[in-house]
Every structure is written in structure tokens, then in C-alpha cells.
Amino acid sequence: GISVQADNVNLLHGSNVLTSAIDGTAGNISFEVDTLRSNVGADGIPLSGAAPVTIASTSTGQGGAGSISFAGKAGEPADAVLLSHTHIVTGVTNAVDPTVVPGNIAMTAQRVELANGTAVRADTTGGADAGAITLNVDTLKTQSGPDGRVLISSDSHCGNQCVGGQAGYITLQGIPGFTPPSTRLYRHVTAPDSEPNRAITYYFAREFDLRGTDIHSDAIGNAPGGIVMMRTNGQASLIDSGVSVTTQDFTINDNKPNGQPAQNQGFSRIDIMGRDIVLKDSTIKANAEVSDIGSCPLCQGGPSAGEIWLRAEHSFTADNSLIANTGHGRAQAG
């Protein structure tokens, strides 16, 4: 693997940090820093016209990808991770073994900023599960730029007649161990009159400000979609942005094609919590698709397009935005 430890790390103008394998497992990449800037100047402004920086752990065929992590020293969060026109990638291409451990991506920092065509991707093709992406932050800001929109994706692309893998979990939240935990009690949906007895602990970030950003956890090819979770006790703003989860040709409560149980019973979900939730020119979408309407495997599985939960403590605002839960080819909406 590759490990970088320094107070300040600057990656500029097409620099690459790579580990890869063919029919083997790629190594891990870790950064332990106070501040990491990638194609960002000392003044915090993205560099204009800079070639993309790539940080990637990838494999092809039999093996799995490694993981990529950004954090501070000695278990502390970093002060800042600032990325412009930067590609962070863990991926398995043409996976032969659908049970390989996926490559995950984690950022733990007080401030994370993703700008100008930055992509954070834990995608797979060929049947392996996609990796998880976890951003543990106090504040998260994203902004599109001349080099494109910001992308955060954990997709499983398999195609027709392929043993599909599950799309991954994408979690945007506070910093466990540093952000005070918040535990809430819930009733089970099947027993609405019972006393709340299910405890769930959250870590809330201070603020999310997402602009020109696409977040998706989509499965293509006989596989369940993933889950996108956002947790803040401040404002969650999505401006000119989209969030999607997609399940294709998968029966809820079934095993995945590789025989392993699906996470969350195969239900995909978008779950956003905040004091205020603001959508402007944005789309929130949960999809289910059946490619072969003759067999229609999803028809027997109950709601299969997943769920959309928008939980605002104070206010919810949607301006020229779409919230959609859809089923295609006889698939059922959630």
C-alpha cells in the first residue's frame, strides 16, 4: 500500500497516486495530514486549467480494490481536505469473483470541499459489490466548475445476463468520536401504537452546502441499489444537484445472485436529516427497473423502488425541484 504522513500535502497538475492489480488485490492508500490540497492554491482557490490529480486503488478480474482514506494524525480528524479537479477512485473492473471485499473511501476532516469536476467513486463492473463512501465532516461544501460537476458515486454496473453486485452505501455525517452522538428512539413501522424501543445513534455534521453535485448509488444488472444518508443538525442545501438510488431486476428480501444476503434486505433508500432541508433546481429520485417484463422478478417482492426520507426538524423547501419514486417495466414504486 501507500501511506503519506505530513502536516501539509499539496498535489498539483496531473499528479497521480496509484496502486493497481490484475487478478489480485490492490493496496490501500492512506493520507494522515493536517491539510490536504489537490489542485487548490494556498489561498484556497482552485487552480485554473490544472490537469486532473488521480488517487486510485483498482483491480481487474479476480482480485479486489484497496481502500482510500484521508484523516488527521494519531486518530484525529484532519483540519481540511480541499479537492479541485481530482479523481478519488476505488474500483473493480470485470470482476470474476462476486464476493470480493469492496474498496471503500473515507474522509475524516473538519472541513471538506470538493470542487470543479472532482469525482469520488467506489464503482464496480462485472458483479462485485460497490464500495462504501463515508465523509465524516463538520462542514461539507461542493461546487461545480469549468472542469465539470462534482460526482460522488457507488455504483454496481453489471449489464444484462450478469450476476450483479449491490450498490454501496454513501454516508455524509459528523465525525464519530468527536461529534457528540445523538440517540433517538423509534417505533417499528408495523407497530405504530407501540412504545418507541429501537435506539439509533446519529452523528450530525454542522452544515452541507452542495452545488452542481451528483450523488448516486445505482445498480445495473440483477442487483439491489444502495443507500445514501446525509446527517446534519444545520442546513442541508442541494442547489442544482441530484441524488439517486436504483435497483434493477432484484426481488426484495432475496439473496443476491452470489448467494449472500443483500444489505438492508435489498431496499434502497435516500435518507436526509437536517434542521432545514433546501432543494433548488435539484432532483431526489429512487428507481426500480425490470429489464425483462415477461419474468418481472420484482413484481413479487413488494415495494422495490426504495424509499425517500426527507426529515427536517424545522423547515423543508423545494424550489423548481423533483422528488420522485418510480418503477419501470412492472417494477413497483416504494
Describe the function of each predicted region.
Residues 1-334:
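Extracellular and secretory-pathway beta-repeat/beta-biased strand scaffolds
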